[in-house]
From Swiss-Prot:
It is an enzyme of class 7 (translocase). The lineage of its organism: Bacteria, Bacillati, Cyanobacteriota, Cyanophyceae, Oscillatoriophycideae. The gene is secA. The keyword Cell membrane applies. Its EC number is 7.4.2.8. The keyword ATP-binding applies. Monomer and homodimer. Part of the essential Sec protein translocation apparatus which comprises SecA, SecYEG and auxiliary proteins SecDF. Other proteins may also be involved. This is Protein translocase subunit SecA. Part of the Sec protein translocase complex. Interacts with the SecYEG preprotein conducting channel. Has a central role in coupling the hydrolysis of ATP to the transfer of proteins into and across the cell membrane, serving as an ATP-driven molecular motor driving the stepwise translocation of polypeptide chains across the membrane. Probably participates in protein translocation into and across both the cytoplasmic and thylakoid membranes in cyanobacterial cells.
Length: 938
């Protein structure tokens, strides 16, 4: 109705940008006639214009003014360097990104190329542009591949990888455009704010950021804080004992019924009943689980949570002697990530693996607050519209939908719902069989490792060949192989959450992938160091690779790069195979036999299979062979491609509605890319988690109402509405949870900014003497206010205690007597003490400098940083504890958030006072050794 009256706001927005696109197109011919040098010279012209700007506002105005020319320059450069030309819709995407908005672009519409436009334009300012992707591999690929365009035009391109040292990072952050991952960017920010000298700081002030897959970073990851932690000792036997006790506690089946604890699946929490407390105390032989001397509550709660809410092969897998988290959004394993607050240890105890040490937070920030540090932020994704409200409310980011270059031909078929899971799996298997018969490729999306194995078993029964892609290490190894052939005729692929797999399923098979896999087969065994085999397979996903590969049982197993033969559409002709062997021999001659790490070898192949310019003769030789193999395969896959299109394209089956409609849409988006035909259908059951947890009683009622056979699908409007409702409920529930995290973290965020700003001042400050003297004067004023009440007559003032306290801090004031100040007013006492402090400080400085010139300046910086870091760390723990306890105040009719803000602020002020006082005390107590010695950096 509104759309009819007022027009679609999205269409209105795009219409506003249309004249800019027309202007860029008009310039195309002029720029096509320029020489390479003249085209690159444009960068110098643009920069000269920008140099005239005197403020950030003026800079933005000039950028808007030169946008059509700059975009036309990038478009021409991309054509010359990459043989890729931006479509009009990609220009629209670039404009939206430059305006600091989110561009929603469908899978396969070339988001990577779109980012080059705003990155170049904003890179001209020299203040730095960060292009953020989800993993190291993609960052490296984009920096090498898209970076060519920027380098051709004279901008510098940097890349940040987790393995780099500080010097390398500084150099890369100084570039005009830097490609990096969200986690590395966040951790570098935290590390910079723990640095002890300004030379250790790697980042520049933030300017402009483009986030790829923005929904997965700003929404899915929003609740996950980035934490830098140090280890603390906790007795491991408590975890083991708690795990034993949790086994003996029983859950309540119905509300207020018998049982030791109640499980709240919605909030992912457990609540102990009075019987539960009593039983646990009796089993442990203690009187109180909350006893401060011997606390048990924390351990018991975590053990019960581990038992009830964290399922093996769904939330985590056990690999060797460790518990590894499985990412609920992408279905990938996340090695190195651990649950906090002792939960990971509780799961380790439950699984009987070695319990690792608990950690203490040294610095933390959520992605929400981190990305809000950028003055200008933008992002791209295939699915953002469903989370539009959140982007606008939390990040102040508008979402604009960019139309596809070719019209979509995908059919989304109606959901079918079965009474129970068993019937659903049978129906899915039958649908796969039908599609397999007709020669259509099928992709089945599941929500966990466990579910993917159930459907796999059903397909085995029917004798249907299929590939399985989940977080199990043995399957991850084969990810690139599986995805390469997922679009082949009649292929059946089962995958846990394809979100973030970053890979395109090409109908008829992906000849680029296949060629690269064939190259690996010959290249890797000759080049990779034997000790590196099996430790690591390429981590990353994207155009040319996928997955994280791991050694499943930590024993050195012989690595094989052989792939299953049926992946290739044909055998290589003898002359081509000979050419490949010669190229590999040449590589061995140049690099040495088995001389590279697996990652280095993968990188050589990655560059060989793309168009990045290279001076390495080995890569050039490999590239020639790669193109020949790719062409051989492509001639055959293109025939199969046409057949698959005739048959109707890729069919995507969803086996459960995800908690977020966005993830469902991502799965759907795998079919019908770039104007290909395709179809999608969801198979559901009334026993699915989503309906069970959030659909509640309505669904249970429906279940009884439908007295149908198990294997009869139920198609009912009422049920579909229930489903939609349940999904919206979950989305709102999680949105509220994220909003709450955001509101609570906002309190911390203001404090974090204040403390980091103070820290940076200290790091950059040349003369900290004045700062320490101010600290000391402030401390003296506070002491005066504590012992002197101006309301009382002077004879009742506690001047002796006042001076005793002052001398505790500054022993050089020991000659002062109460009689020296008894005739003064309060302001006069303060002024007098301030003067005495300055004299005392000069004395102290002379004494320290005598032992080693310049030492006092170092001592000032050292003590201020040491106190800030120590007390901030304690403050983080105290704030965490406050946050845990403040929730209970809701029962006392108080708003927990307001209480948290108030008390958090008071705690922060106290911490700032403690920092000041401790610095003053430490500096006056500081006795330098005779031999030249510097205070150690913290």
């Amino acid at each position: 109705m509104f759309k009819k009256l007022f027009g679609d706001p999205n269409a209105r927005k795009l219409k506003r940008f249309q004249p800019l696109v027309a202007e860029i197109n008009l310039l195309a011919e002029d720029f096509a006639n320029l020489t390479d040098e003249a085209l690159a010279q444009k960068t110098v012209e643009f920069r000269a214009k920008l140099d005239k700007a005197n403020s950030d506002e003026e800079t933005e105005e000039i950028l808007d003014e030169i946008l059509p020319e700059a975009f036309a320059v990038v478009r021409e450069a991309a054509w010359r360097v990459l043989q890729m030309r931006h479509y009009d819709v990609q220009l629209l995407g670039g404009i939206v990104l430059h305006k600091g908005q989110i561009a929603e672009m469908r899978t396969g519409e070339g988001k990577t190329l779109v980012a080059t436009l705003p990155a170049y334009l904003n890179g001209l300012t020299g203040k730095g542009v960060h292009v953020v992707t989800v993993n190291d591999y993609l960052a490296r690929r984009d920096a090498e591949w898209m970076g060519q365009v920027h380098r051709f035009l004279g901008l510098t391109v940097g890349l940040i990888q987790s393995s780099m040292g500080p010097a390398e990072k500084i150099e890369n952050y100084r570039c005009d455009i830097t490609y990096t991952t969200n986690s590395e960017l966040g951790f570098d920010y935290l590390r910079d704010n723990m640095a002890t000298t300004i030379q250790e700081v790697v980042q520049r002030p933030f300017n402009y950021c483009i986030i790829d897959e923005v929904d997965s970073i700003l929404v899915d990851e929003a609740r996950t804080p980035l934490i830098i932690s140090g280890q603390i000792e906790r007795p491991t036997e408590k975890y083991l004992q708690a795990a034993e006790i949790a086994k003996q506690l029983v859950p309540q089946v119905e509300e207020d019924g018998p049982g030791d604890y109640e499980v709240d699946e919605k909030a992912r929490n457990v609540l102990m009943t009075d019987e539960g407390f009593a039983k646990a105390e009796q089993l442990l032989g203690v009187t109180d689980l909350y006893d401060e001397q011997n606390p048990w509550a924390h351990y018991i709660f975590n053990a019960v949570k581990a038992k009830e809410l964290f399922k093996k092969d769904v939330n985590y897998i056990v690999r060797g002697d460790e518990v590894v988290i499985v990412d609920e959004f992408t279905g990938r394993i996340m090695p190195g990530r651990r649950w906090s607050d002792g939960l990971h240890q509780a799961i380790e105890a439950q699984e009987g693996v070695t319990i690792q040490k608990e950690t203490q937070t040294l610095a933390n920030i959520t992605y929400q607050n981190f990305f809000l540090l950028y003055p200008k932020l933008s992002g791209m994704t295939g699915t953002a519209k469903t989370e539009e409200t959140e982007f606008e409310k939390v990040y102040n980011l508008e979402v604009t939908i960019i139309p596809t270059n070719r019209p979509t031909k995908r059919q989304d078929l109606a959901d079918v719902v079965y009474k129970n899971e068993k019937a659903k799996w049978r129906a899915v298997a039958e649908e796969c069989a039908q599609m397999h018969e007709t020669g259509r490729p099928v992709l089945v999306g599941t929500t966990s490792v466990e579910k993917s194995e159930i459907i796999s078993a059903y397909l085995h029964e029917l004798g249907i060949p299929h590939n399985l892609l989940n977080a199990r290490p043995e399957n991850v190894e084969k990810e690139s192989e599986i995805v390469a052939q997922a679009g082949r005729k009649g292929a059946v692929t089962i995958a846990t959450n394809m979100a973030g797999r970053g890979t395109d399923i090409i109908l008829g098979g992906n000849s680029e992938y296949m060629a690269r896999l064939k190259m690996r087969e010959y290249f890797m065994p000759q080049i990779v160091k034997p000790e590196d085999e099996g430790n690591f397979a390429i981590a990353g996903s994207g155009k040319n690779s996928g997955g994280q590969g791991f050694d499943t049982n930590n024993k050195q197993k012989k690595k094989t790069w052989k792939t299953t033969l049926d992946i290739y559409p044909t055998e290589l002709p003898t002359d081509l195979e000979q050419q490949l062997k010669e190229a590999v021999k040449f590589a061995v001659d140049q690099y040495g036999n088995q001389s590279l790490t697996e990652l280095e070898a993968e990188e050589k192949l990655a560059i060989a299979s793309e168009n990045a310019p290279t001076a390495d003769p080995v890569v050039q030789k490999l590239r020639t062979v790669y193109h020949a193999i790719e062409k051989t395969y492509h001639d055959l896959t293109s025939v199969e491609h046409d057949e698959v299109i005739q048959n109707g394209g890729l069919h995507v089956i969803g086996t459960e509605r995800h908690e977020s409609r966005r993830i469902d849409n991502q799965l759907r988006g795998r079919a019908g890319r770039q104007g290909d035909p395709g179809s999608t259908r969801f198979f559901l059951s009334l026993e699915d988690n989503l309906l069970r947890i959030f659909g509640g009683d309505r669904v249970a009622g429906l279940m009884n109402a439908f007295r149908v056979e198990e294997d009869m699908p139920i198609e009912s409007k009422m049920l579909t509405n229930s489903l939609e409702g349940a999904q919206k409920k979950v989305e709102t529930f999680y949105y509220d949870a994220r909003k709450q995290v955001f509101e609570y973290d906002e309190v911390m965020n203001n404090q974090r900014r204040a403390i980091y700003a103070e820290r940076r001042r200290v790091l950059e400050g040349q003369d900290l003497k004045e700062q320490v003297i101010q600290y000391a004067e402030k401390t003296m004023s506070e002491i005066v206010e504590a012992y002197v009440n101006p309301e009382l007559p002077p004879e009742e003032w506690k001047l002796d205690k006042l001076l005793d306290k002052a001398k505790e801090f500054i022993y050089l004031l020991e000659d002062l007597e109460p009689k020296d100040i008894e005739d003064m007013t309060v302001p006069e006492i303060k002024t007098f003490l301030h003067e005495e402090v300055r004299k005392a400080y000069d004395l102290k400085e002379a004494q320290v400098e005598k032992s080693q010139p310049g030492l006092m300046r170092q001592a000032e910086r050292f003590f201020i940083l040491q106190q800030i870091d120590t007390l901030w760390r304690e403050h983080l723990q105290a704030i965490d504890a406050l946050r845990e306890s403040v929730g209970l105040r809701g029962y006392g009719q108080k708003d927990p958030l307001i209480e948290y803000k108030q008390e958090g602020y008071e705690m922060f002020l106290e911490m700032m006072i403690d920092i000041r006082r401790n610095v003053v005390y430490s500096l006056f107590q500081f006795q330098p050794q005779r031999q030249p010695q510097q205070p150690q950096a913290v």
